[in-house]
Amino acid sequence: MEPNCVQFLENRTILVTGASGFLAKVLVERILRLQPNVKRLYLLVRASDKKSAEQRYDVALGINTFGAINVLNFAKKCVKPKLLLHVSTVYVCGERPGHIVEKHFAMGESLNGKNKVDINTERRLADQKSKQFKEQGCSEEETEQAMKDFGLKRARLYGWPNTYVFTKAMGEMLLGHYRETMPIVIIRPTIITSTFSDPFPGWIEGLKTVDSVIIFYGKGILKCFLVDQKTVCDIIPVDMVVNAMIAIAADHCHDSGSHTVYHVGSSNQNPVIYKQIYEMMSRYFMKSPLVGRNGMLIVPKVTRISTLARFRVYTNLRYKLPIQILGLLSVISLSQRDKFALHNRKFKMAMRLVKLYKPYVLFKGIFDDKNMETLRIKNEAKDMEKLFGTNPKCIDWEDYFMIRISLAS
């Protein structure tokens, strides 16, 4: 482990927000294992939230947008604050193709350039909508779905694909606009996956991102999937993200007034495409198939479709229409009800996966990581990178995925 980062952590007071989250848990474990002489760790824990693209708009604004400015205001009141390290996501950059540079947002900037984002107006509109649905006597479930739809509509108005990345982008804007002299670093990881090496290879909490697809594929639930197989799957192990966070903090803790963005991913340094991942999954489950409830071996077979239009036609004809017919039969025949419920549940589960991953499986962008690469070169010159890995070039994707598929299954 390189001495600079270990020394940086010694006698430090660190506040970690969202401390019950996957990334934060790995960060806290890493800090304590590296430097037991850290002065204080304050861990902010709150009730669980659904951190997803489907979050209702008012909740997402409260957490991702105004939560960020609340942290900044708190940091300003601290005695001699050294750095505010804000974790965002690369997907705040939207769905545009090509090389995407590490650039922070200007206040009010939109992705499509058609409308200026007024964050206070967005909060007012969200509050008005929520109040309107309550006054109309809508149920909690109806209100939640309506607020999700409203958030998606607002996001797309400005060029963002979903509520989550839109509200995260607005959070970045507020930090940049109101930071004054506060040193701020924004870290934008790509899709965070299980550990590469620390605390041991393949660790992950629950089923996240790629792991859920692996399980549904292995169980034979995933019959078709929307994916451009030539698209790069930009994933990064969680321990590499945490290593980057600590290395970046150590490098910037004395930079007064800095406002830097770091992309932390693999697409620019060591890309892996979806076709490769599919082939790895296929090879694994051919050798080690799962066993179904009936005791029969499951042989997964997935139809991969590269465009959304073709996918909709295929799924409507192949699955949705037969399920709807089965639903009609279940009304007049009790024996068909369980069969209908089973197939309908599987179909909805698969469609939810597709909806969740659509912005990523058709994504044509490559995230530039010039700032991260500069820091890596600096650490390599000090012979530190070997012990404190942040370089995705060292990942052998075949080995990485075989361990993950084995653990997930």
From Swiss-Prot:
Query: What Pfam families does this protein map onto?
Result: NAD_binding_4, Sterile
Lineage summary: Eukaryota, Viridiplantae, Streptophyta, Embryophyta, Tracheophyta
Q: Which GO molecular function annotations are given, in alphabetical order? A: alcohol-forming very long-chain fatty acyl-CoA reductase activity
The organism's place on the tree of life at top rank? Eukaryota
Which of UniProt's keywords are assigned here?
Answer: Lipid biosynthesis, Lipid metabolism
InterPro entries in UniProt: FAR, FAR_C, Far_NAD-bd, NAD(P)-bd_dom_sf
The family note in this entry says: Belongs to the fatty acyl-CoA reductase family.
One of the protein's GO biological processes: lipid metabolic process
Protein name, entry field:
Putative fatty acyl-CoA reductase 7
Q: Which organism is it from?
A: Arabidopsis thaliana
Q: Which SUPFAM superfamilies match?
A: NAD(P)-binding Rossmann-fold domains
